Each structure stands twice: as structure tokens, then as C-alpha cells.
Amino acid sequence: MRVVSSLFLPVLLAEVWLVSSFNLSSHSPEAPIRLVSQDYENQTWEEYEWADPRDDNEYWLRASQQLSNETSSFGFSLLRKISMRHDGNVIFSPFGLSVAMVNLMLGAKGETKVQVENGLNLQALSQAGPLILPALFKRVKETFSSNKKLGLTQGSFAFIHKDFEIKKTYFNLSTMYFDTEYVPTNFRNSSQARGLMNHYINKETEGKIPKLFDEINPETKLILVDYILFKGKWLTPFDPIFTEADTFHLDKYKAVKVPMMYREGNFASTFDKKFRCHILKLPYQGNATMLVVLMEKSGDHLALEDYLTTDLVEMWLQDMKTRKMEVFFPKFKLNQRYEMHELLKQVGIRRIFSTSADLSELSAVARNLQVSKVVQQSVLEVDERGTEVVSGTVSEITAYCMPPVIKVDRPFHFIIYEEMSQMLLFLGRVVNPTVL
């Protein structure tokens, strides 16, 4: 088994596909991106040169905290939607999906834009200004980028059909706030387009996702891809010498053998008496943390998801105590792909996927333009050195004498977040660590 050099790697890719019924004139594959100048637009971004609405650092701190809370709530809601479709392993990024949708929202107007804001739980924040959401995400991304120990790399590609005209304002805003790299693409030649896009994504994810695209609709006009590469190293690694094959109980009747890591040391943890679950913190270098939620009894993990909220997680964190413990934790790898557009419809984001979509801030030929797909793929690897991956009910929590051993040998949930911003980076569950 190959050992990944930097341990825990979530790789996240969020694709957004825009499809039009127009047949536009042909240009050479090398043709530059066609921008419609502002001089010829009916410009509605009056505050295009918009700066921070306030210079008050306290305001930005409060707004960033609210952004993190709402992104977490959005993530927990999506987890419940995913669980309605299947009960297996899960890994996705609420942060990555929110970034992709807010990037796209720069091109939306009217009810189309409002539905995206509401679906992401960001309608209250957006009232501060037309570009407050992109500005907030930009600040968060810059904070991550400046923290080299965090090991988080992000980026955005826009594969745009060679003769599709986008508004200069959208081009500039998406570049300014999301560092979007635009790549001219001939979607009429689907095999060429597929090869080009897979080449870019394979390179940026360091080979973790070599073939993201299979089939390409020749009517596609724009594909947005946001990616996150997280190479988290445990603050205190597990020693591979102590890793041994052990039993992981899938349920009361089935079990599998997995490589089980072991470490003795000081761990922050607590126990929720109401939900009967252990909560364990596994810190990374660079102020990131994996929170492991392990039910006391095997088979109860799905029931917990109905009650997961930002308030509940905050209570867990506040109640944690650091103790000397023995921890057993399985090595595993996850690779999950989700048709997020179907899930987004369930949280009220529907118009952007219909013929009623208003994307007139994105293109002057926005009539008949709609989003056909939002796809997210995440890869997560966890081993001894770390990770390498491409509002609620108050519960009674009672401090108690933690058992000397926590053995994660049954299905569990994990929450990966950045400590300073409290931003939820990845969320998921492991039901069977031997299955991708």
C-alpha cells in the first residue's frame, strides 16, 4: 500500500455547467475569450469598483463568523439531503460548494440570485452590499493562503466556449474575488474539450482526480470548476510501527479488517450524554482540526444527523477537556462524487437550473442560458502522518471521566474545520473504511 507523503488530503472539485441552445459562429480554438465591453452593456453593478463596505475590523470579524456559521448550517442540511439518497460513506465540502455558487451568483439577477442567497443561508449577510459575499469569501481564502502550515490550496477555472461572449464585468469580478482562470475551450469537439479539462484538473489536484470529465454536452458554454487541495499534517502524528490490522464493525452482524492506527497522548474530548456519543479532536498543523463523532452504539450514527447543528457542535467544543488517552483510529480513503444540482434544488435553489434562469449579469446572450449541472467530487486519504484530500436544540452535556481508550472501530462522522475562522472545510461520515 502506498503511503501518501502528507497524509490527509481532501481534494474537492465543484463543477458548474452552463448550457445554451444558441449555435454561435465558429472561431479558431486559439481564439481569445470574448468579452462584451462595459460601454455596450446595460451595466447593473453600479458599485463595480466597490470596496469594503466598512473599514471596521470588528464588523468584518462578526461578518466572517456569521459566514462560517451559515456555511456550517448549509453543510449539515446537505448532509441530511445526501443521507436520504444513500447510507454509505460521505465526503463533501460545504465551503467549496458555497464558493462555486457565490462565484456563479455574480452573473445572476432577480429571483435567480435571491434563491441562491437563500439556499446558501446567506440572505442576511448579502444585505450589506452587492459584493459583500464575494468579499467575505475572498478574505477567508486569503487567510487560508497566508497560512502555509495549513496546507490548503484553492483555485477556480472557467472553461469557456471559444465563441461565447461573457460580460467584462463578470470576468473582472470573478477574477478579482475568486482568482478565476479562464480557459478558452471548443466544446463542439467534445473529446478535445474533455482532454483539455482533465489535463488541467489532474495537474491542479496532483493526480488525485485524473478523469473528472467523461461526457461533454456540445451545447455547453461554460464550466466553472472550483478545487480545494488540503494536505493536512497531524499536529502529533501516529507512529506507523503501532498500526495493525483490526476489526471495524459495519453493524451488529458485519465486520471488516482495516489498518488501525494507535497513539497514546493528550487528546481533547467530551461525551454527549443525550446523544450518547464521543467527540474527539484530532488537530492538524496550521490551526485546522478534525472533529470525530463516534456513537456509543454501532448503528446509531444516521439518527444523529437529524440533530447536527452549529450550536450543538459549539457546545461540544466548549465542553471539551484534555486528558491522557489511548486512541485507535482507522486508515481510510474516500472518493465521492455528487450531483449537487439535485440537492441544491431541495434547499430551494431551483430557478437557476430552469429555463427561467436570469444570468444576464454573466452574458449579454443570457436568454436560454441555464445551469445544467453542479457536480462535486472529493477525495480524502487519512494515514499516520495526516490527511491528504483533494440554530439547534440545546442538548444536555455532562462532563464525565473519559474512558482511557477511544477506539474508532464502528461508523463515525468527521468535521474538518479551520480554527481561526471556524470555517467548515469538509464534512462526512465513514461507514466502511475499506470502500471508496
Swiss-Prot record:
InterPro entries: PZI_serpin_dom (IPR033835), Serpin_dom (IPR023796), Serpin_fam (IPR000215), Serpin_sf (IPR036186), Serpin_sf_1 (IPR042178), Serpin_sf_2 (IPR042185)
One BP annotation, GO: blood coagulation
Keywords assigned: Blood coagulation, Glycoprotein, Hemostasis, Heparin-binding, Protease inhibitor, Secreted, Serine protease inhibitor, Signal
Glycosylated residues, chain numbering: 23, 42, 69, 172, 189, 287
Tissue expression summary: Expressed by the liver and secreted in plasma.
This protein's GO CC annotations: extracellular space
SUPFAM superfamilies: Serpins
Residues in the signal sequence: 1-20
Main location: secreted
Disulfide bond residue pairs: none
Gene3D superfamilies named among the record's database cross-references: Alpha-1-antitrypsin, domain 1 (2.30.39.10), Antithrombin, subunit I, domain 2 (3.30.497.10)
Family membership: Belongs to the serpin family.
Other comments on record: Heparin acts as an important cofactor, producing 20 to 100-fold accelerations of SERPINA10 reactions with factor Xa and factor XIa.
Name the record gives this protein: Protein Z-dependent protease inhibitor
Organism of this sequence: Rattus norvegicus
Lineage: Eukaryota, Metazoa, Chordata, Craniata, Vertebrata
